[in-house]
C-alpha cells in the first residue's frame, strides 16, 4: 500500500509525541526502580545503565523514518504498546484498515 502524503505528514507530526509519552513512562519506571531501598546503589546504577542502553534503541524512543515502511512501523508501535489502534483515528480509513488487517493476520 502506498501511503498518502497526508498520512505521511501526520505520522511524522505524531511520532514525536508518541515517543515523548513512551519515554515519560520509562522515566517513571526508572524513578520507581531508583527509589527501591532494598538494592544497593551500585546495583541500581549498573542496572539502570543497562536498561537505558537497551531502551534507547526501542522504537518508542528512536525510529528511522521511511515512507515505504510507515504501515509496518505503526503495526510495530502498536504491538510494542507505544500507541494503540485508537491513536490512528485521524489517519485515512485506508491506512487504518491496512493496519487492522495486518494486526488481525498475526494474532
Can you say where each PLM-predicted feature lies in the sequence?
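Acidic, Ser/Pro/Thr-rich low-complexity regulatory regions
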Residues: 1-107
Amino acid at each position: 500500500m502506498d501511503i498518502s502524503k497526508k498520512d505521511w505528514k501526520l505520522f511524522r507530526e505524531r511520532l514525536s509525541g508518541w515517543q515523548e509519552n513512551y519515554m515519560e513512562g520509562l522515566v517513571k519506571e526508572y524513578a520507581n526502580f531508583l527509589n527501591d531501598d532494598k538494592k544497593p546503589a551500585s546495583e541500581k546504577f549498573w542496572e539502570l545503565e543497562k536498561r537505558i542502553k537497551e531502551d534507547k534503541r526501542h522504537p518508542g524512543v528512536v525510529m528511522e523514518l521511511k515512507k515505504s515502511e510507515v504501515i509496518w512501523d505503526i503495526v510495530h508501535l502498536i504491538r510494542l504498546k507505544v500507541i494503540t489502534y485508537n491513536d490512528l483515528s485521524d489517519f485515512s480509513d485506508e491506512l487504518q484498515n491496512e493496519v487492522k488487517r495486518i494486526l488481525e493476520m498475526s494474532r
